[in-house]
């Protein structure tokens, strides 16, 4: 059986979602700062799944490869899917076949990156994070006003 799970806000949480510090353990540190936590129960259950030979745990996340490697409880697994599906890890290393496939797609679309950034910058006042290219695969940003973006998408879809 496969047990696939997202990471952020599913089995791991930032400090703003931690109500009781005694019920969690820090599982990610960046620049000497604790940034992510898991409940003791979640850690126990993940370890049970990892140690059960009939279940294969596969973490799936939007996190970059570097961000994923900081999350200790989900390391040393046969498979993981990171970078929004752009990287498939096998025993902690990117699968070369998938990497080659994704790279060929990204190279074909590379000339569109400027247009994508231009589009994102039209909504700069609604962004809380500067757009960034993750692992040379996809753009990531955060928005403050999702209604504006949803309206834009609705308008774009009706024009098609």
What residue ranges belong to the model's regions?
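A signal for specific C-terminal beta-sheet/loop modules enriched in small/flexible residues
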Residues: 3, 24-29, 94-114, 150-160
């Amino acid at each position: 059986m496969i047990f696939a799970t997202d990471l952020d806000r599913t089995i791991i949480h930032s400090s703003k979602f931690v109500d009781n510090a005694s019920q969690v353990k820090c599982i990610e540190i960046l620049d000497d700062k604790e940034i992510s936590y898991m409940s003791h129960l979640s850690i126990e259950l993940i370890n049970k799944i990892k140690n059960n030979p009939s279940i294969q745990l596969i973490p799936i996340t939007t996190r970059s490869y570097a961000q994923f490697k900081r999350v200790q409880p989900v390391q040393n697994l046969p498979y993981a899917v990171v970078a929004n599906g752009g990287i498939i890890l096998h025993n902690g290393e990117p699968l070369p076949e998938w990497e080659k496939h994704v790279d060929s797609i990204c190279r074909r679309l590379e000339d569109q990156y400027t247009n994508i950034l231009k589009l994102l910058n039209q909504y700069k006042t609604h962004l809380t994070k500067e757009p960034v290219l993750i692992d040379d695969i996809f753009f990531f940003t955060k928005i403050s006003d999702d209604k504006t973006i949803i309206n834009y998408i609705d308008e774009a879809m009706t024009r098609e």
